[in-house]
Amino acid sequence: MILREFLDKEGTEKNLAELILFLSGQAREVKKGFLSTCMNTGACGTQNMFGEDQKPLDKYADDVFIHALQKSRLVRYIATEEQDHVIEVSGAKNQFGVVIDPLDGSSLLDVNLCVGSIIGIYPGHVLEKGTKMIAALYMLYGPLTLLTFTTKHGVHEFVQCETGEFVLRHENLKIPEGKIQSPGALRRDYLTAHAQWISCLENEGYKLRFSGCFVADVHQILHKGGVFSYPGYKGKESGKLRLLYEANPMGMIVCEAGGAASNGHTDYREIVPSAIGQVTPLYIGGKKEIAKIESCMREG
C-alpha cells in the first residue's frame, strides 16, 4: 500500500494528508544533493544560530524544504534548525506550523553514514508544547530511504521504491523489549545521576550503539528496543539537542510507539518553549529505561 492510500484509509484530515505527502516528496530532492555536493563536505563559512559550522548539504537541505513549502503555501509557519527566526508564509492556505531539522547527522556524510530529516507539524504557531503537535515524521537516508510517521494513530514505516512512491513496510510499530543504549556526550563530562544510570545499563548487559545520527539511532531503538540519551553534562547542563526541531518530533514518534520521553525529570514535551533555539536534556526509548533515569535523578 502506498502512502497516499494509507493516509486515506486511516482517515487523515485532508489538508494534513496533503502536507505529509508533500513533505515526503522532498526526500528525493534532498538525496539529489548528496551527489551534487559529495565532493564538497567542508564547512560553508557560515554558522547556524547555535554557532555550528554549516556544511553545504545543511544549507542545501534547508533550502529544499523552505523553498518548497513557501511555494506550496501549505503551511503558515516554518522554523528550521538552520534559521534564526520563524518564517511566516504569505498567502498560506492552511494555518499549520512546521519545525524541521533538514539534515540530522550531516557531519557523517563525508564517511558515507546514514543521515536523516526530522519534521514536526503543529496546528498553528510552533512555539507550543510538544504535546500540541498533530503529526511528526522522519526520513532516514541509508541503504534504503525510509519514512516513519505518526498522526497520533500509531507509528508507521514506509520505504521509497524506484518510482519515488513510499510503500508500507511496517504498520503500528511498537518498541520491543531490548538492550541497546545510545548515549551522547563524553563520559568524563557526565553528571552524577546520569553516570549512575549508564552504569546500571552496562551492568544489565545493554550494548552501546551510537552513530552520531539521532534519526538512525532512534530508528534502531524503535525496532530493537532500548534507550537513546543525550543528557545535560558539565558545561552544558541544559542539554544540547533542540527541543523544537529534534526532541519534540522524535519524542512524539517514540511515545506513540509505546515508549516514553523525558528530560530526566518529566516529559519534556509538556514544556512551552521560550525560544526557537531552546535545548533540553533528552532520554527517549522504552518506558522501563525512562522510569529508571527519572528515579536516578530523584535520588540525586
Swiss-Prot record:
Substrate binds at D104, G105, S106, S107, K240. It catalyses: beta-D-fructose 1,6-bisphosphate + H2O = beta-D-fructose 6-phosphate + phosphate. It is found in: Cytoplasm. Mg(2+) 2 binds at D101, D104, E246. Pathway: Carbohydrate biosynthesis; gluconeogenesis. Its cofactor is Mg(2+). This is Fructose-1,6-bisphosphatase class 1. It comes from Methanoregula boonei (strain DSM 21154 / JCM 14090 / 6A8). The gene is fbp.
